[in-house]
A protein has these predicted regions:
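C-terminal leucine-rich, beta-strand-based interaction scaffolds used for sensing/assembly
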Residues: 2-7, 292-374
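A short, basic N-terminal segment
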Residues: 1-38, 43, 61-62, 352
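Conserved AAA+ ATPase "SRH/arginine-finger" region at the nucleotide-binding site
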Residues: 214-225
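Short regulatory helix/loop adjacent to the ATP-binding pocket of P-loop NTPases
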Residues: 195-213
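Amphipathic alpha-helical "lid/sensor" segments that cap RecA-like P-loop NTPase cores
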Residues: 227, 231-293, 303, 355
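P-loop NTPase nucleotide-binding core
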Residues: 42-46, 50-155, 336
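Short, locally clustered residues in the helix-turn-helix/winged-helix DNA-binding domain
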Residues: 32-33, 254, 268, 310-317
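Conserved Walker B catalytic segment
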Residues: 126-194, 203
Length: 374
């Protein structure tokens, strides 16, 4: 069903509701068409998932017979979790005739017992597996062999791919690399939001995926293109959003896609011409809705960690967190304590490091923190 609001904050519908990224899309299409896997790196909420789905949409337009798969492994905690998610995403999706699908699954997946159910509308089998820890590696190999046996060209996107480095099992990277490297009909997009970890995985000569992909790092959508997209959709609804007001929104959040999109979604929903007063009202509404969540989140951190978080938020971006001027300006503790606090905030992704310095990961949380007193 066509969205009521053109400014989507989750999911993907069609190119009509997707802004720009023409160069990045072209890069992905060219790589996949020519048999190259892609390592797609972007901060969370910059739009990498939408870009993947847009690229898959375009691929299906050009080659209707291909099969695309998308799995987000952010919540997986082990190889077993990964295998079960991979199985439920892939198994049964390569054949249009249910009986043929069942036959092929049983032919390849022998290390565990698949459980089949059927979609009431399409008849396509849905498969879940219960795999014993001792069989996880074999089951993963069988699923990949099942993909490789298809006469169809397949494209698989694995989002938050760096999560496999957190699994307790050793050697998952090497295992996966060894299973996929000789597939002739399957290509992968490995997408991730932890930039340093992803770069280490794909550019270090010591890692299994070294030089096995074409790297692609994305940043904000071009401001002019985004402005045309936004003002155009308001205009189609007989509403006015001036380029100056859009620019103020874009610059406030430095083009970070989800936050810009979230605010535009609110403004469009008000069904009024947009002025700066309405923008301020929308921001107040959003921060009010998140305020309890943010306050509750801070309860898990020490006073020193919270104080550092607020200090970074007040500055916006801090080049040297351990600099004496910064520590004294916000009456922080000793440099060693600040260093330990920073490490904790980085690990929990409340703060992230850019080329310019340290920033609050959640732009709305940063704004909420700036409104809080010390």
């Amino acid at each position: 069903m066509k969205p009521n609001n053109p400014f989507l904050i989750s999911g993907y519908y069609s190119p009509e509701f997707f802004c720009d990224r023409e160069q990045e899309t072209g890069t992905i299409l060219d790589a996949l068409h020519n048999g190259r896997n892609v390592a797609l790196i972007a901060p969370r909420r910059m739009g990498k998932t939408g870009l993947v789905r847009h690229a898959f949409y375009r691929l299906k337009e050009e080659q209707p017979d291909i099969v695309t798969f998308y799995l987000d492994i952010y919540s997986t905690q082990s190889l077993g979790d990964f295998v079960r998610l991979f199985a439920s995403t892939v198994l049964g999706q390569l054949d249009s005739v249910p009986q043929k699908a069942l036959s092929r699954i049983c032919q390849f997946v022998r290390s565990c017992r698949p459980v089949f159910t059927f979609d009431e509308l399409t008849g396509v089998p849905k498969v879940t597996i219960d795999v014993a820890p001792a069989e996880e590696e074999n089951t993963l190999k069988e699923i990949i062999e099942y993909l490789g046996s298809s006469e169809k060209r397949c494209y698989v996107a694995i989002d938050e791919f760096q999560q496999i480095t957190e699994y307790p099992e050793k050697g998952v990277e090497a295992l996966l690399r060894s299973y996929i490297q000789f597939l002739s009909n399957v290509n992968f997009i490995f997408a991730g939001s932890k930039q340093h970890m992803m770069q280490e995985m794909f550019t270090s000569s010591k890692r299994p995926f070294y030089q096995s992909t074409q790297p692609l790092t994305i940043g904000p959508i071009q401001q002019d293109e985004y402005a045309n997209f936004a003002t155009g959709h308001f205009s189609l609804h007989n509403l006015e959003l001036s380029q100056d007001i859009f620019n103020s929104i874009y610059e406030k959040y430095e083009g970070h896609t989800w936050y810009v999109q979230c605010l535009l979604n609110r403004l469009y929903g008000y069904d009024r011409d947009v002025d700066m007063k309405l923008v301020a009202y929308a921001i107040d509404q959003i921060l009010s809705e998140y305020s309890y969540t943010y306050a509750d989140m801070l309860k898990a951190y020490s006073s020193g960690q919270v104080r550092l978080l607020k200090a970074i938020a007040k500055e916006g971006c801090v080049k040297e967190v351990l600099a004496g001027d910064f520590i004294s300006a916000y009456r922080l503790r000793a440099a060693s304590s600040v260093s330990a606090a920073l490490k904790k905030l980085l690990e929990n992704e409340l703060v992230y490091q850019t080329a310019d310095g340290y920033m609050i990961y959640d732009r709305f949380m940063g704004e909420w923190l700036r409104r809080q007193g010390f």
